[in-house]
Amino acid sequence: MTNIRKTHPLAKIINNSFIDLPAPSNISAWWNFGSLLGVCLILQILTGLFLAMHYTSDTTTAFSSVTHICRDVNYGWIIRYMHANGASMFFICLFLHVGRGLYYGSYMYPETWNIGIILLFAVMATAFMGYVLPWGQMSFWGATVITNLLSAIPYIGTNLVEWIWGGFSVDKATLTRFFAFHFILPFIILALAAVHLLFLHETGSNNPSGIPSDSDKIPFHPYYTIKDILGGLFLVLVLMMLVLFSPDLLGDPDNYIPANPLNTPPHIKPEWYFLFAYAILRSIPNKLGGVLALIFSILILAIIPLLHTSKQRGMMFRPLSQCLFWLLVADLLTLTWIGGQPVEHPFIIIGQLASILYFAILLVFMPIISIIENNLLKW
């Protein structure tokens, strides 16, 4: 009798994706982040579901309902902080996952890569809308500033902003619709992640060497299941340390002040994971230019495959490209720091230089260095 695991229509899908899947024998811990993102997503959906049971999306009661969750609901405080810090863990895993893709040339699988970019945008949109829900000062003013950026679109901008707001300012209608979108988007992300996986399994995983590994495959289970479980345990350990020891470390104190349209906070800034993009936005004095730079700072990932000039896939054996890659990482950390600083000298010029360097590395230096490396190897 054949194994039910291999014949049952549903079990067969699970089997071919997580059990009998042929995987390269040499994929390192950098390949763990896909499964970690899955763990993050499930965790966020579950904690979010329990929060939604007690949250009210009305301007008069939203802030109070979050306080009520933390004070009166059984274990509400831990659910709330797991959800808030879970978002930070989600983005740490996302950035490392995308960084791995850039380093090892995983972008050479265009369908998987492009769906990954759509996923990145979807997660960013979800996180932004989630940050608005507690209806603190930073929630309100963050929503006002970011939605206002759409008014930079010529001709239809103002109408578009008022349409999104559902009125002439960020108000009750805005909060209600943001809650609706924040609830539905994670399920769309879940579906997209399944498609992401589907396309990945069409080609099989890349590996650190960048060389096809068809001749050297091992079954996913038990080798990579145990590895993913270890990674997941480590993720939960770090998350729980953050939640139980310093839950407000990554948050903004201003968000403990209820939203007040008559009082602007001295420094409006988004959560830490958006600061690099916020720094790029602020580094251009023109509103439309800033918005375009902001969008292109993420969308640039879509043209990375077109800029691949190297004869090798990954950067494992390309020391010059490696130097550029780590310069890019340092540049992004600099942008993250600048995004959280006030708009004054010397932060303005540092932000502008870091923004120029970010685009220069990806669009100019990387392709040129790759050609130089090809010539050095006489390829």
Swiss-Prot record:
SUPFAM superfamilies hit by this protein: a domain/subunit of cytochrome bc1 complex (Ubiquinol-cytochrome c reductase), Transmembrane di-heme cytochromes
A GO MF term: metal ion binding
Pfam families recorded: Cytochrom_B_C, Cytochrome_B
Binding site for heme b b566: H97, H196
Compartments in which it is found: Mitochondrion inner membrane
Record keywords, A-Z: Electron transport, Heme, Iron, Membrane, Metal-binding, Mitochondrion, Mitochondrion inner membrane, Respiratory chain, Transmembrane, Transmembrane helix, Transport, Ubiquinone
Topological category with respect to the lipid bilayer: Multi-pass membrane protein
Cofactor note: Binds 2 heme b groups non-covalently.
InterPro entries: Cyt_b/b6_C, Cyt_b/b6_C_sf, Cyt_b/b6_N, Cytb/b6-like_sf, Cytochrome_b, Cytochrome_b_C_euk/bac, Cytochrome_b_N_euk/bac, Di-haem_cyt_TM
GO (cellular component) term, any one: respiratory chain complex III
CDD domains: cytochrome_b_C, Cytochrome_b_N
BP GO annotations: mitochondrial electron transport, ubiquinol to cytochrome c
Alphabetized PROSITE patterns for the sequence: CYTB_CTER (PS51003), CYTB_NTER (PS51002)
Residues that, per the record, bind heme b b562: H83, H182
Transmembrane segments: 33-53, 77-98, 113-133, 178-198, 226-246, 288-308, 320-340, 347-367
Sites where the protein binds a ubiquinone: H201
Additional observations: Heme 1 (or BL or b562) is low-potential and absorbs at about 562 nm, and heme 2 (or BH or b566) is high-potential and absorbs at about 566 nm.
PANTHER family: CYTOCHROME B
Family: Belongs to the cytochrome b family.
Biological function: Component of the ubiquinol-cytochrome c reductase complex (complex III or cytochrome b-c1 complex) that is part of the mitochondrial respiratory chain. The b-c1 complex mediates electron transfer from ubiquinol to cytochrome c. Contributes to the generation of a proton gradient across the mitochondrial membrane that is then used for ATP synthesis.
Subunit structure: The cytochrome bc1 complex contains 11 subunits: 3 respiratory subunits (MT-CYB, CYC1 and UQCRFS1), 2 core proteins (UQCRC1 and UQCRC2) and 6 low-molecular weight proteins (UQCRH/QCR6, UQCRB/QCR7, UQCRQ/QCR8, UQCR10/QCR9, UQCR11/QCR10 and a cleavage product of UQCRFS1). This cytochrome bc1 complex then forms a dimer.
UniProt protein name: Cytochrome b
Organism: Pekania pennanti
The gene coding this protein: MT-CYB
